[in-house]
């Protein structure tokens, strides 16, 4: 986040220290902690051997939902996901302009209901992920 947010956001690379509201929902993320961030990273690293693509998308969605930083959470999460996807030869994630509203709607649904992550990931697989075999 420090790299992505440099000269763009306040306190790049630092965890958010205040409550925030999200547009389009009454849901509010908890304050992030170093322990929660480390736990998410550890969960990601421990799951990579099963299905790398699914693990990367899950990590991205959870990082977005965490809202760890003051700004740039979706940008940072997508850049990290694309870095990992490319590194593992699993394609690239890109949300087309015509899919942005549906993506936002599905993301908010996931924020409000943890179980909706599978619907969000299926949308990402079908409409936003190019050059990937979804079974690996």
Annotate each predicted stretch with a short phrase.
Residues 1-136:
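FIC/Doc superfamily catalytic core
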């Amino acid at each position: 986040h420090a790299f992505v947010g440099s000269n763009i956001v306040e306190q790049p690379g630092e965890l958010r220290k205040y409550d925030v509201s999200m547009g389009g929902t009454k849901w509010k993320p908890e304050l992030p902690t170093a322990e929660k961030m480390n736990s998410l990273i550890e969960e990601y690293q421990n799951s990579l051997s099963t299905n790398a693509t699914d693990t990367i998308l899950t990590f991205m969605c959870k990082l977005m939902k965490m809202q760890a930083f003051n700004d740039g959470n979706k940008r940072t999460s997508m850049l990290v996901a694309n870095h990992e996807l490319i590194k593992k030869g699993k394609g690239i994630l890109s949300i087309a302009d015509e899919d942005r509203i549906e993506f936002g709607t599905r993301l908010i649904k996931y924020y409000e209901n943890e179980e909706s992550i599978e619907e969000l990931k299926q949308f990402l697989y079908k409409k936003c992920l190019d050059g990937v075999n979804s079974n690996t």
